Amino acid sequence: MLKHWRNRAAALGLSLCLVGALCPVAQAVGPEVSAQSAVVLTADTGAVLFEKDGHTPQPVASTTKIMTALLALEAAQEQGDPLVDITQEMVAVEGSSMGLQAGDSISLTGLAAGMLLASGNDAANAAALYLDGSLESFAARMNQRAAALGMEDTHFVTPSGLDGEDAQGLGHLSTAYDMALLARAALEDQAFRQLCSSPSLAVEFAEPVKRVTYTNHNKLLAQYQGCVGVKTGFTKEAGRCLVSAAERDGALLIAVTLNAPNDWQDHTALLDYGFSQVEPYQLAGGDVRLTVPVVGSPVEVVSLRGSNGGEVTLPLGQGAQVERVVHAPKFLYAPVESGEQVGEICWYLEGQLLGSAPLTAAGAAPLQEKAPSLWERLFG
């Protein structure tokens, strides 16, 4: 039905722009937090609601496992969730553990659960070594994904988040803002979201055959209404680190604190503040009605109709700054099918795409039948 609508149009000359007056948005006083760095943003649009030193690179401890678990889950989905045979090299790591032993056999998804609930460094190492053969190669995979997500001030060295340096002397560092970007991407993966939002989870081992129940270290799952994750972390150098997410009235917010002595209290204050600073905004396009001429059809014009693009979460007062752009062709070539997408409606805020919806043909325009030739008229 789509038929590459952009290629069918002679020109997208009817780009209609509808935008409200640009109004300054009053900024409320943000919360006092113990964290050295903190960020709160909306998950759907990425709008920053609060920031404290959010772009300074520093150690992020086990919140690193958000990346490791996401990569493991993606590989599990691609490879049919293979079993990982645990080796001594995989479990030779200090710190928190899911209790793996050499000779165990467990799925990649089971390892991801061990990372996100028990914060297992052994699980992180096992996934890294299984997927890429060495911790260095897996770190390259992590950094490649970080770059793709726009994590400009991040450099990963270890899959677990333990402090370390690579061969070039670069440390394992990220920022509160970058970790929020990572959480935003990870929460779009339903398997990841299910794991990190589970207060506890039973994980099956294939060898030896057993079931082990792990309890999530994230106290906010029980303490904060609507909390859906994400990951705790601590090392002596990083201090207490926490990435959280909570959902309320359709709005999903992400909060990050790094080096926060009172991280639980910080996140309660940050999320409460964030929810007080947002409102839903409907990407309305159902009112769009246009007509365009059709070439090569007995139907001379076709009506086009827009559709709504759903609902997004915006900072208070910024709905007036949303720009709606209607991309419609100057004309169409027959045949045109009813319901066929022939254009697009896009919504932007400060140049960032908030969403899009199809512009479709409200009626059909069949191809003009070829006139019979003289021979066909005489002898047909």
Question: Where in the sequence are the language-model features?
Answer:
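Domain-terminus/edge residues, biased toward the C-terminal soluble/receptor-binding domains
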Residues: Q168-G380
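Active-site-adjacent loops and short helices of periplasmic peptidoglycan-processing enzymes
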Residues: A26-Q190
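Hydrophobic alpha-helical segments, especially transmembrane helices
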Residues: N7-A9, I66, R248
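Bacterial N-terminal signal peptides that target proteins for export
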Residues: L2-G13
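C-terminal segment of classical bacterial N-terminal signal peptides
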Residues: L16-Q27
